[in-house]
Regions:
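N-terminal short leaders/motifs
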Residues: 61-85, 130-143, 216-230
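Edge beta-strand plus adjacent loop/short-helix module at the start
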Residues: 98, 141, 231-260
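Bacterial N-terminal signal peptides
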Residues: 17-29
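Extracytoplasmic/periplasmic ligand-capture domains
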Residues: 15, 36, 40-44, 105-107, ...
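N-terminal secretory signal peptides that target proteins for export/translocation
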Residues: 1-12
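Surface-exposed binding/hinge segments that line
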Residues: 169-246
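N-terminal lobe/hinge region of extracytoplasmic solute-binding protein
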Residues: 47, 52-123
Length: 490
């Protein structure tokens, strides 16, 4: 039996740097002493009796964040965080930034409980027992319990009208769906006859699956729990086709289109669409606290301003945001640096979360039998890699700030190996040509392009979305260097 208890850290530092907003770490579950009496933002509501005091809003064992893991100190309450999004649909990024998950990744990419107090996984990896935090509440003060998991499993994803195709695939092992059990009010279990290696990683994903729902709220829109005439009246009032469409519209935990829907996130949406300014306010029942017992997050409000993406660099340079991570790219670096001192902001370079900024994937299942045989020969793929001048790309497109690499796992991963990152990445025209000659592809046409075994010129078509100008520029440079090994790119 493997038991995961909250003991380490989940970080959103790539997104938020030094801003401590209660989403930086997953820690222990013992409430420390020394917390301040109340969050200033809620003092009036508590004084009027419309909101319970802080200690009554927290779970019995909240998630205590270990700031020491990242060298952070206890912060101060107040203020707001302003950023810009290119489209109103991008308010969903609040779920990404908040990173409230049943389990989440720590600094070493290990999974740790967050919303959960503990998690038991058997040695075979096919039985997962989830332990909730007693006293944990939804943002409206209603208890967060096993009923919210049961409702999702029985009344949503296994309801033919709401989910005609059934539960999501990560809740299957092969063709076998999960066996779901409610153990008690604060414990649920998912099991399969075989291991499910995707279950926990899916729960910790950037876009979580939300295998729980606010049952106390959504039942009013479900045919199983609402009088048929009343429910039909609601459907007709909104001009919808069915109760299932109504239920779906009132749910949408990722899209955030319903401001009345209870949440477990650190900030709650308060602005209805359409709008060009979306305001999120702090969740009074959020489950994390700092080392002194102060409820997180520290920041009272999060504001997403919507703007044309082309204007974002100028707005950032004019000091209209507190922090901006989306939409900007390295091509904006020099412009933003010019206004850094005047606008009193810092331009920081962040590591990307992918193994490489861009990657080329030869089609190993190409329908053309001649090309398929060529591409499946590892010597051909190695020659293509050796024919890419990564140093030139770095200098021309990334100001020399990038690192030549293969597309592989990040160095922080326990699966990382230097040879995965460094093999065949040195620009070596001589070695690339030798590999292609060794394959028998030594004949060329009048333009110096190699010929395939059937005599056709070696012309490769690279398909892209065409949405990233940097990718287009990169492909142009690669095309130039591939010409030196007798390969033409379209």
């Amino acid at each position: 039996m493997i038991k995961l208890c909250a003991s380490s850290a989940v970080s959103a530092r790539r997104l938020f740097g030094g801003l401590m907003m209660g989403m930086g770490l997953v820690g222990t579950s013992l409430l420390p002493t020394g917390a301040q009496a109340e969050i200033p933002y809620f003092e009036d509501a508590v004084a009027k009796g419309t909101l319970p005091p802080m200690l009554q809003r927290l779970p019995e064992h909240p998630n205590v964040i270990d700031f020491g893991a990242e060298g952070k100190t206890v912060g101060k309450y107040g203020g707001e965080f302003v950023t810009i999004m290119g489209r109103s649909k991008d308010i969903r990024m609040a779920v990404v930034y908040g990173y409230a998950r049943l389990v989440g990744y720590d600094q070493d990419l290990n999974l740790q409980p967050d919303i959960l107090e503990a998690l038991d996984v058997n040695e075979e990896g096919n039985v997962f027992t989830l332990h909730l935090r007693k006293g944990h509440k939804w943002s409206d003060g209603a208890p967060f319990t096993a009923e919210d998991f049961r409702y999702y499993w029985e009344d949503i994803v296994n309801n033919d009208e709401l989910f005609p195709v059934g539960p999501p695939r990560f809740l299957f092992v092969g063709d076998e769906p999960a066996s779901f059990e409610v153990i008690d009010e604060y414990t649920v279990r998912y099991s399969w006859s075989r291991p499910n290696p995707f279950f926990l990683t899916e729960l910790a994903a950037t876009r979580p699956p939300f295998i729980y729902r606010p049952a106390h709220y959504l039942k009013q829109f479900h045919e199983k729990y609402r009088d048929a005439a009343e429910l039909d009246a609601l459907v007709q009032e909104r001009g919808l086709r069915s109760w299932a469409v109504l239920h779906t519209d009132m749910d949408r935990p990722y899209k955030l289109s319903n401001i009345d829907r209870p949440s477990l996130e650190p900030w709650l949406i308060t602005t209805e669409e359409p709008s060009d300014r979306f305001v999120f306010v702090r969740n009074p029942y959020y489950h994390r606290v700092d080392p002194e017992g102060n409820q997180l997050p520290y920041i009272d409000r999060m504001i997403f301003n919507i703007s044309n993406s082309k204007l974002v660099p100028a707005k950032v340079g004019a000091g209209e945001v507190d922090l901006q991570s989306r939409i900007l790219s390295l091509k904006d670096y020099t412009f933003l640096k010019q206004s850094e001192a005047k606008q009193n902001y810092q331009v920081r370079l962040w590591d990307v979360g992918a193994g490489a900024y861009a990657a080329l994937y030869p089609n190993l299942t190409c329908s053309d039998p001649v090309w398929r045989d060529v591409i499946r020969d590892v010597r051909f793929r190695r020659a293509l890699s050796l024919g890419i001048n990564r140093t030139e790309i770095n200098r021309v497109l990334f100001f020399g700030l990038a690192q030549p690499t293969n597309n592989t796992v990040l160095p922080k991963s326990p699966l990382f190996k230097p040879e995965y990152r460094e093999s065949f990445i040195k620009f070596d025209v001589k070695a690339a040509n030798a590999l292609l000659d060794e394959m028998g592809l030594d004949k060329r046409d009048g333009d110096g392009i190699r010929l395939l075994p059937d005599g056709r010129p070696m012309e490769i078509i690279v398909e892209t979305t065409g949405e990233n100008p940097e990718h287009d520029d990169m492909l142009e440079l690669i095309g130039d260097s591939w010409r030196k090994i007798g390969v033409k790119m379209y």
